[in-house]
Amino acid sequence: MSILEKITSSPSECAEHITNKDSCLSKKIQKELTSFLQKKETLGCDSESCVITHPAVKAYAQQKGLDLSKELETRFKAPGPRNNTGLLTNFNIDETLQRWAIKYTKFFNCPFSMMDFERIHYKFNQVDMVKVYKGEELQYVEGKAVKRPCNTFGCVLNTDFSTGTGKHWVAIFVDMRGDCWSIEYFNSAGNSPPGPVIRWMERVKQQLLKIHHTVKTLAVTNIRHQRSQTECGPYSLFYIRARLDNVSYTHFISTRITDEEMYKFRTHLFRIA
């Protein structure tokens, strides 16, 4: 079985929470844009996202007072390098996690962080995990600041400092489900967590031990999954997605996930920009 079969995502360009995969658009927008959708080939399009970003359609929507930007932001996957091995940006990553937070209503999506988060004021280093669990920590879902109880937390970090252009993406996942809670670090290259991450994990562990009896820290790094120079972003997002779908962290310890599977996973992550 392919690892992709263990998760609930699909190559559809619709956002994960859209159940009607025949169309990603709301019924109102479908109705208003029927004539454009029926002749999308004449616009040079083969997808709904292409249609609603076409200049002629955008001009028509503006005249009609239709908010197509909201459709793109909430009903479609994020734009990104879907059919190539382009490096993922922080926008690709954060926009994907924001969309997953719509589908997984107990997931706290934390904006990306660089590795000097102890010195720079990144959200990652300011989060109180007890407040996350109790629904007292602000997060952004569908463009709105909300507070809601969350039993999972995910963030993608870059191993470079904020003065650099980026080196390697890694994932943090906090699982506050079940009897034993865990604070997990995943690195597709198999490298151990650096000092700032170790200190962050220990600090969060002490926070959570105030409200739960068993909390452990895990470095899921015993296998070098990644062999390419491009897939650290997809691997990091895949780890978070797999854990949200209840794939155990032990799977990443016992089974190598290939770069080829991450090439395919890109079609699950993004719509064509």
Swiss-Prot record:
<keyword id="KW-0945">Host-virus interaction</keyword>
<keyword id="KW-0788">Thiol protease</keyword>
<feature type="active site">
    <location>
        <position position="168"/>
    </location>
</feature>
<keyword id="KW-0645">Protease</keyword>
<keyword id="KW-0899">Viral immunoevasion</keyword>
<dbReference type="Pfam" id="PF02902">
    <property type="entry name" value="Peptidase_C48"/>
</dbReference>
<feature type="active site">
    <location>
        <position position="187"/>
    </location>
</feature>
<feature type="binding site">
    <location>
        <position position="226"/>
    </location>
    <ligand>
        <name>substrate</name>
    </ligand>
</feature>
<dbReference type="GO" id="GO:0044423">
    <property type="term" value="C:virion component"/>
</dbReference>
<dbReference type="GO" id="GO:0019082">
    <property type="term" value="P:viral protein processing"/>
</dbReference>
<dbReference type="InterPro" id="IPR003653">
    <property type="entry name" value="Peptidase_C48_C"/>
</dbReference>
<dbReference type="GO" id="GO:0006508">
    <property type="term" value="P:proteolysis"/>
</dbReference>
<comment type="similarity">
    <text>Belongs to the peptidase C63 family.</text>
</comment>
<protein>
    <recommendedName>
        <fullName>SUMO-1 cysteine protease S273R</fullName>
        <ecNumber>3.4.22.-</ecNumber>
    </recommendedName>
</protein>
<dbReference type="InterPro" id="IPR016510">
    <property type="entry name" value="VPRT"/>
</dbReference>
<keyword id="KW-1090">Inhibition of host innate immune response by virus</keyword>
<comment type="function">
    <text>Cysteine protease that plays several role during infection including processing of the structural polyprotein or inhibition of the host immune response. Catalyzes the maturation of the pp220 and pp62 polyprotein precursors into core-shell proteins. Plays a role in the disruption of host pyroptosis via specific cleavage of gasdermin D/GSDMD. In addition, strongly decreases the host cGAS-STING signaling by targeting IKBKE via its enzymatic activity. Also impairs host FOXJ1-mediated antiviral effect via degradation of FOXJ1.</text>
</comment>
<keyword id="KW-1035">Host cytoplasm</keyword>
<keyword id="KW-0426">Late protein</keyword>
<dbReference type="GO" id="GO:0030430">
    <property type="term" value="C:host cell cytoplasm"/>
</dbReference>
<feature type="active site" description="Nucleophile">
    <location>
        <position position="232"/>
    </location>
</feature>
<dbReference type="GO" id="GO:0004197">
    <property type="term" value="F:cysteine-type endopeptidase activity"/>
</dbReference>
<dbReference type="GO" id="GO:0052170">
    <property type="term" value="P:symbiont-mediated suppression of host innate immune response"/>
</dbReference>
<keyword id="KW-0946">Virion</keyword>
<keyword id="KW-0378">Hydrolase</keyword>
<dbReference type="InterPro" id="IPR038765">
    <property type="entry name" value="Papain-like_cys_pep_sf"/>
</dbReference>
